[in-house]
Amino acid sequence: MSIFDVAVWDEAEHCARMLDQRRLPNEVVNLYYRSAAEMADGIRDMVVRGAPAIGCACAYGVAVEAKRLAKQGIPSHWPTAMAEGMATLRQSRPTAVNLTWALERMAPLLETTPPHEVPQRLLQEAHAIREEDIASCRAMGAHGAALLPTNSQRPTVIMTHCNAGALATAGYGTALGVIRAAHTAQQGNLRVIANETRPYLQGARLTAWELLQDHIDTTLITDNMAGWLMANGEVDAVVVGSDRVAANGDVANKIGTYTLAVLARRHDIPFFVAAPLSTVDLRCPTGREIPIEERSANEVTHCMGIRSAADGVKVRNPAFDVTPAELITAFICEKGVAKAPDQEKIAKLFQI
């Protein structure tokens, strides 16, 4: 068992297992899931987060639902039997396109697999999705590491936002995969600035913890310090992940990403986005069509369970924002790199 096993199949318990990321970094706790409804609750409640990891969790959610139904007797028509559970999973996090991608990959198997083999076949496909994601992350890490600047006078300093690492994927990470690969390529001569990422503190709780596990020099800042550090020449590049990429290269990512992209452009700092092609939604023409999840006001008014805002104040809590493609230096995926991404360049990545 790896400490970064965020969404896997537990052979001993015969069900899905997820690392409860809400408890990090203070506790390492695993939770177990035996139905699609339970898995959807786990996804919605952010036990797991990060688009690729959500996709893996969703796939295992389909597998556990089939296993649950099979215990009651093999359904005469699997698509009908699975419809409610799959709909529940689909609605759990609307912005992360990998969730829908995983469901659409699993659904045809309900029609084409002999009925008695469906539960095992779905589990095999969930395993395949997980293994493919790990390989994808390592490939984009190699592509991205070659793009990052080097600094002969001091360690290269990379800023990142939210958590796009092993905890947000099946393993290794997208943005942090690029950072891990660059750290190796530059023989450790690299530092990371992790934005704390209000209001859920994924940068402080997850990214800082994850990078420290790998002994990568990491400095934590509050989100509103980023511009000052850029203005003072303390940042060489910004690398982030994505929850959905539109066909034209616009990117939805954790709220605050757009702000960083604008600041990076102002200070001539390269701004990179790393995500697998499964995160690209070719049916979504531009970022304007990406649904933006609005989460609970409590995430803003409370911090680690303690109220920090005036009682009765109104709250906005969009979980994501959209960064226009024109602000992105390059989009990095497992197939390669699209510099100054646009619709034509994104489409070409699917042809490699």
UniProtKB/Swiss-Prot annotation:
Keyword annotations for this protein, in alphabetical order, are: Amino-acid biosynthesis, Isomerase, Methionine biosynthesis
What's the EC number here? Answer: 5.3.1.23
**InterPro entries, per this entry?**
IF-2B-related (IPR000649), IF-M1Pi (IPR005251), IF_2B-like_C (IPR042529), Initiation_fac_2B_a/b/d (IPR011559), M1Pi_N (IPR027363), NagB/RpiA_transferase-like (IPR037171)
What SUPFAM superfamilies does its record include? NagB/RpiA/CoA transferase-like
Summarize the protein's role.
Catalyzes the interconversion of methylthioribose-1-phosphate (MTR-1-P) into methylthioribulose-1-phosphate (MTRu-1-P).
Q: Where is the active site?
A: 243 (proton donor)
Instruction: Please identify the protein, giving its name as recorded.
Output: Methylthioribose-1-phosphate isomerase
Q: Report whether Amino-acid biosynthesis shows up as a keyword of the record.
A: yes
Task: Tell me the protein family, please.
Answer: Belongs to the eIF-2B alpha/beta/delta subunits family. MtnA subfamily.
Residues binding substrate, per UniProt: 49-51, 93, 202, 253-254
Tell me the organism: Magnetococcus marinus (strain ATCC BAA-1437 / JCM 17883 / MC-1)
Q: Which residues are annotated as site, described as Transition state stabilizer?
A: 162
One Pfam match, given by its short name, reads IF-2B
Superkingdom classification of source: Bacteria
Q: Does Transcription show up as a keyword for this record? A: no
Gene Ontology MF terms: S-methyl-5-thioribose-1-phosphate isomerase activity
